[in-house]
Amino acid sequence: MRRTFNFLLLFFLSVMTVMAAPGDLQEKLAALKGISGIEKLQSDHYPEKYVVRITQQVDPKDPAAGTFTQRVIVGHVGYDRPTIIVTEGYGAAYALNPKYQEELSKLLNANLVFVEYRYFLESTPEPKN
């Protein structure tokens, strides 16, 4: 779990410290290690919004246990804005809605990183054990 947290922290810090022209976020995300898919989403509040899939080991102590894909939603308003991270305790499907905006993100005009919890919805390892 700590390894996953460290990876996610590094991932999000990398996203926010890279200075790039608008529209380059998708390329920057795709260049990060472990990213297995990016899909652009529609949003009423974020100029750029993506579903990012991160491939991780099921058990960091046992690489033979395989991997799973964790779903993360990234809403981007600017490199000069703060970032809110939501570590949802369940599924993240509601964050896919174009009208969704986290309350703090709205108040601070902040970027959003919304992490779906492992073993929920699309972030479920196969087989579950």
Predicted regions and their residues:
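Active-site-proximal flexible loops/turns
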Residues: L9, A95-L96, S123
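Bacterial Sec-dependent N-terminal signal peptides
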Residues: M1-D24
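Conserved alpha/beta-hydrolase
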Residues: S105-S123
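Residue-level signal for secondary-structure boundary elements
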Residues: L9, G37-K40, E116
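Catalytic nucleophile-loop/oxyanion-hole region of alpha/beta-hydrolase
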Residues: S123-N129
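Catalytic-loop region of hydrolases
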Residues: A20-A110
